[in-house]
């Protein structure tokens, strides 16, 4: 996917989330530069792969096939001594007419 398509998908999902008055965690809006300055206090976010996923499954037609996802919480069975959650919380957004 082109960066412009990813940015448009992010913006569309952000608007939907705002419409329903759901508050995203601050890390969903960090820039790459901000992430570069984040220390070990943010390892849980990195280790558990929290944040955005936008995909068109490599097919090149996001409007027809794909989805947007935000992982807010995620279990990590590989690091269960450090992270005890055994569940995930995710927001999934599929546009009308879009297949996933």
Task: Annotate the PLM regions.
Residues 1-86:
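A short, N-terminal "cap"/entry segment at the start of jelly-roll beta-barrel domains
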Residues 86-87, 91-97:
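Short, conserved beta-strand element in jelly-roll/cupin
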């Amino acid at each position: 996917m082109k960066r412009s398509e990813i940015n448009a998908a992010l913006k569309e999902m952000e608007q939907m989330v705002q419409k329903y008055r759901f508050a995203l965690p601050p890390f969903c809006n960090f820039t790459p530069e901000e992430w570069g300055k984040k220390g070990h206090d943010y390892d849980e976010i990195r280790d558990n792969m929290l944040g955005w996923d936008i995909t068109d499954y490599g097919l090149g037609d996001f409007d027809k096939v794909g989805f947007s996802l935000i992982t807010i919480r995620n279990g990590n069975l590989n690091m269960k001594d450090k992270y005890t959650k055994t569940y995930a919380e995710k927001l999934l957004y599929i546009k009308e007419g879009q297949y996933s």
